[in-house]
Design a protein with these regions (language model features):
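Positively charged, small/polar-rich N-terminal and surface patches that mediate targeting and assembly
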Residues: 1-108
Length: 108
């Protein structure tokens, strides 16, 4: 069996209103993020109370989470891009240390 090689990256979990998906994905694309996963229709409780996930009329009316694995050097520029946004809108970015086995998926 071939030995697995692990590489350290940072995982960003970005939670925001679905109507701002374009802003967030554009920021990630411009920062050089190679890919991300978008999860729609979140439920949860935060500083604005409980948010029930449901798609009644369109996907802009729900909370979404965008998950991205990025090199540590990209974290600060991405957070700087979100800072003005989060001063006016609700949401949060969680940052975690992770290990990945296929670094080629995240590199240039």
């Amino acid at each position: 069996m071939k030995e697995l090689n692990f590489s350290s990256l940072k995982k960003l979990e970005i939670i925001l209103d679905g109507e701002h998906r374009g802003f967030a994905t554009d920021l990630l694309d411009r920062a050089g993020v190679k890919g991300y996963t978008i999860i729609n229709n979140l439920s949860g409780k935060g500083s604005h109370g409980f948010h029930e996930g449901h798609v009644m009329f369109n996907e802009d009316d729900v909370l979404i989470m965008i998950i991205a694995a990025v090199p540590p050097a990209l974290v600060e520029p991405i957070l700087e891009g979100f800072a003005p946004f989060y001063s006016k809108h609700s949401g949060v970015v969680f940052i975690s240390d992770i290990q990945v086995t296929r670094l080629v998926k995240f590199a240039d």
